[in-house]
């Protein structure tokens, strides 16, 4: 049986169950010919599912609400981590000092932008600060590259990926994660 699986992101450690299954021949042993498709855009899998071009897609639970369609259903999670927004140290200082903040994200729309803003505003309230000068810019998937290029923060970051990558790149960061501001975790696939 041929199964096409569209990812939400480029292949990375989040996708280990699929990578290991292919590497160990587990799918072939069960007569499954799995094709993994890396997207150009974060929502490509939803479009391909809706058009019946693929059988499965991965994406974060919040996008299932955002991109709801009658012919698409969630069959479960295979992965969960902490996550939220990662700031450069300078970006975080700008945030608490009320300066303009530019945040890179793979998507920018009213739903995801509101969640990012909620994280920031809840954090600022806890430390008795305010800042409404926040701009979210849609870019590609490479958060750490954008932080190193001058963005103040990156949104929709996962600890197991961008959290680790920032350490490996020697980038000093301040993390504002969902759990820090009492928002239920949705950093899962």
Residue ranges of predicted features:
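Short, glycine-/small- and polar/acidic-enriched structural segments
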Residues: 2-138, 148, 153-160, 175-176
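Pocket-lining segment of extracytoplasmic ligand-binding domains
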Residues: 61, 142-143, 151-189
């Amino acid at each position: 049986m041929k199964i096409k699986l569209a990812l939400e992101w480029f292949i990375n450690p989040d996708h280990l169950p699929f990578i290991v299954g292919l590497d160990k021949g587990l799918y072939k042993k069960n007569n499954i010919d799995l094709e993994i498709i890396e997207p150009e855009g974060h929502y490509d899998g939803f479009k391909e599912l809706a058009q019946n071009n693929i059988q499965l897609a991965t994406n974060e639970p919040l996008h299932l609400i955002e991109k709801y369609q009658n012919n698409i259903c969630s069959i479960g999670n295979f992965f969960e981590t902490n996550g939220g927004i990662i700031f450069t140290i300078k970006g975080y200082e700008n945030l608490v000092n009320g300066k303009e903040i530019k945040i890179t994200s793979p998507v920018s729309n009213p739903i995801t932008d509101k969640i990012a803003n909620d994280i920031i505003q809840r954090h600022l309230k806890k430390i008795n600060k305010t800042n409404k000068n926040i701009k979210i810019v849609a870019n590609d998937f490479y958060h750490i590259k954008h932080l190193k290029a001058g963005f103040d923060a990156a949104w929709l970051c996962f600890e197991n990926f961008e959290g680790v990558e920032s350490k490996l790149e020697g980038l000093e960061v301040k993390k504002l994660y969902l759990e820090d501001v009492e928002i239920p975790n949705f950093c899962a696939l």
